[in-house]
């Protein structure tokens, strides 16, 4: 059984838009260890599955109107109908992952994983802008519900099993 939690605040600037996303996420799932350890070792090469949820908000700082017959310089819009906060957003997705963890000291591991995500649902009803970024999922577009990421981790495993004293 595996769980991950996180929080994120990220401001992103592109050619046409500047926005800030802030929120938190939780991921719950399982890891299946595919590696048989030598005696005394506790390393992992694993496949995993996660169900994830994120609660977040967008803040559109400014954007540039795109016009095909642009003659003058770009007009940057920093106030008006489409700027400002888009609150109370949430999204759910599933993650498939492959990774490895190496024990560096007792109950502490260092590792990395490659994750493939598929967006299951989101509640973006906003007429202002579509989804741009989801904490824990990463970048989103209107045409694509898939994503990927590479993570490196430092993990502490809470020991739930204790040795019986004789």
Located regions from the model:
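Outer-envelope beta-barrel architecture signal
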Residues: 1, 24, 41-45, 92, ...
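Hydrophobic/aromatic-rich structural module bridging two neighboring secondary-structure elements via a short loop
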Residues: 2-48
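Extracellular/periplasm-exposed beta-strand and loop segments of Gram-negative cell-envelope proteins
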Residues: 6-23, 56-91, 123-131, 137-151
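Structural signature of outer-membrane beta-barrel domains
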Residues: 8-12, 33-35, 52-58, 117-123, ...
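Residues on the lipid-exposed face of transmembrane beta-strands in outer-membrane beta-barrel proteins
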Residues: 28-32, 49-53, 96-102, 112-118, ...
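Hydrophobic, well-structured mid-protein blocks that either form specific transmembrane helices
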Residues: 28-76
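Short loop/turn motifs that connect adjacent beta-strands in outer-membrane beta-barrel proteins
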Residues: 35-44, 104-110, 160-166
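Outer-membrane beta-barrel "beta-signal"
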Residues: 144-166
